[in-house]
Curated annotation (Swiss-Prot):
Pfam families: DUF188. Belongs to the UPF0178 family. This is UPF0178 protein lpp0103. NCBIfam families: PRK00124.1. The lineage of its organism: Bacteria, Pseudomonadati, Pseudomonadota, Gammaproteobacteria, Legionellales. It comes from the Bacteria.
Amino acid sequence: MTIWVDADACPKMIKDILFRAAIRTNTNLILVANSYLTYPNSPFIRSVLVEKGYDRADHYITSHMKAKDLVITADIPLAAEVIVKQGLAMSPRGELFTANNIKQRLTLRDINEQLRSAGERTGGPSALSAREKTNFANALDRWLAKSK
């Protein structure tokens, strides 16, 4: 079992939670990014540097992940592909993406994309709140407990 992180856009506070959890539970954690990252020296944590380019990190993750692995991402199309491959996808806000909710999330994403293309301002995600940070940590702990 491995935790994969779409690391370029993952907030630092979420990566810090992941680092502590990986070390505490001896769980493999792989950060995939197109820029260099700093992370604790641990046999359970490593990073993969992919070429800069559209969806390079996503393709790497989906090519190397296995069923039941956890992928941390805010990227809805990546989450959908993870679910197809029998993995679990979780947002940095602690939201689990499932077969039951991913189609709705993809549709909403596509609508927002069309609005942006038409010149509408849809705004980006709000800053991560303390409650969302706690939600993420709790969801991660539940997954780790089930997976061991």
